[in-house]
């Protein structure tokens, strides 16, 4: 115990001798400072210069690759947006969600469909499901029906060029710059394509889910959500500083749910309610 106590006291003494802000610099630090001011530390050895060149080359590569990614993604996104605008007439006709509005103010819920689901509940129990439906997105109040633009239109800010010192300064750096910029460019194009595909998949999922809900609604398999209106001819707010005339407040009073099987009403149609 006495030995441990001595060790602790020694450590305490050691840490107590550490310099803190406000103390004088030790002689070693003063010497380094003086030599740096006089310029006596600039005589680099060959190995030191090579190390500095390697560090700069690595920085040049990173800068070129990063800039290439940004420029590639920006270029490809502009291409995609241009193609979408050129085909806007067809898209406006193809992707129409106004038919999924209830009372012109509420967007229908979406329904997910899964086939041949197998669920293993431990070693002694399992379940095989031929078909399942799940209410996914709840109904929501909207000012207008969403369009394809809400899903697919994306803007990217124009990338900023690298700072002057980041550009290559010799043939070795120029060669590395070219390779890394091209590699980054195509990586950026790939990223822009993935972003667009993700947006497209999201739109397809939502539109398909809306059609599926309407198909189930036609058979009374699901209930229709209810939109409530609370109308006030005059409403005074902010201690009399604001007045609303003909104010209408919309609220979703009842969400959708699946009906009992006994309430289902099979409908024979030509597929108009279950369009894909």
Residue ranges: model-predicted function:
Residues 1-9:
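Bacterial N-terminal signal peptides that target proteins for export
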Residues 16-18:
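N-terminal signal peptide c-region/cleavage motif recognized by signal peptidases
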Residues 22-151:
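N-terminal Sec/ER secretory leader and immediately downstream segment
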Residues 104-276:
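Mature extracytoplasmic/lumenal regions of exported proteins
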């Amino acid at each position: 115990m006495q030995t441990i106590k001595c060790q602790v006291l020694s450590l305490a003494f050691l840490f107590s001798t550490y310099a803190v802000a406000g103390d004088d610099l030790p002689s070693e630090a003063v010497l380094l400072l003086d030599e740096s001011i006089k310029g006596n530390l600039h005589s680099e050895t060959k190995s030191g210069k090579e190390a500095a060149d390697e560090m700069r080359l690595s920085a040049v590569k990173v800068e070129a690759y990063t800039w290439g990614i940004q420029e590639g993604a920006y270029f490809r996104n502009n291409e995609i947006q241009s193609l979408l605008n050129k085909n806007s007439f067809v898209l406006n006709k193809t992707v129409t969600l106004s038919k999924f509005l209830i009372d012109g103010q509420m967007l229908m819920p979406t329904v997910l469909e899964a086939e041949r689901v197998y669920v293993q509940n431990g070693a002694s129990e399992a379940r095989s499901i031929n078909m399942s439906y799940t209410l996914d997105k709840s109904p929501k109040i909207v000012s207008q029906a969403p369009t394809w633009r809400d899903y697919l239109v994306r803007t990217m800010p124009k990338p900023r060029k690298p700072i002057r010192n980041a550009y290559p300064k010799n043939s070795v750096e120029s060669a590395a710059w070219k390779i890394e910029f091209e590699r980054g460019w195509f990586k950026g194009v790939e990223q822009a394509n993935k972003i667009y595909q993700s947006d497209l998949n999201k739109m397809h999922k939502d539109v398909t889910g809306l059609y599926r809900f309407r198909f189930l609604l036609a058979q009374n398999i699901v209930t229709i959500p209810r939109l409530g209106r609370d109308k006030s001819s005059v409403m005074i707010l902010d201690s009399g500083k604001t007045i609303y005339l003909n104010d209408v407040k919309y609220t979703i009073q009842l969400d959708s749910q699946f009906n009992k099987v006994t309430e289902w009403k099979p409908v024979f149609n030509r597929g108009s309610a279950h369009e894909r």
